[in-house]
């Protein structure tokens, strides 16, 4: 279970708010993270998949820096959350950025990707969401 504030306001998002009809890709990222910039085009491609909900968790970052990052590189996320002190990410078992977690519609973790996503990860994510 998790409860994290949105980047845009002080309202909270909880795992019970996840829709049950899609897969969810939770991406933990930061504007200061160079590998996050490297993987960003793959997230943009994944954002075009109808069966996938992209959730970005901005990690140990400033709101303005995070917004500028998304303004410059594009926003692939359906939902953007903010973990300014990193405690929520640590609760997920995340100790660095980027990390990405694929969750099915029953909120079960399918796969965890440590480090930047690459073309092979992109294929694996598509295979996972369309095979089930």
Regions picked out by a protein language model, each given a short descriptive name:
Residues 25-26, 54, 100:
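Hydrophobic beta-strand anchors of alpha/beta hydrolase catalytic cores
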């Amino acid at each position: 279970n998790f409860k994290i504030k949105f980047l845009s306001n002080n309202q909270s998002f909880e795992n019970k708010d996840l829709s049950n009809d899609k897969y969810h890709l939770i991406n933990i990222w930061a504007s200061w993270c160079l590998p996050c910039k490297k993987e960003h085009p793959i997230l943009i491609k994944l954002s075009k998949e109808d069966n996938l909900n992209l959730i970005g968790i901005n990690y140990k970052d400033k709101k303005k820096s995070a917004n500028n990052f998304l303004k410059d590189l594009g926003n692939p996320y359906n939902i953007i959350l903010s973990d300014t002190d990193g405690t929520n990410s640590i609760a997920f078992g995340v100790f660095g950025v980027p990390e990405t977690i694929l969750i099915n519609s029953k909120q079960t973790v399918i796969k965890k990707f440590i480090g930047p996503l690459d073309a092979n990860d992109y294929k694996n994510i598509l295979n996972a969401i369309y095979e089930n």
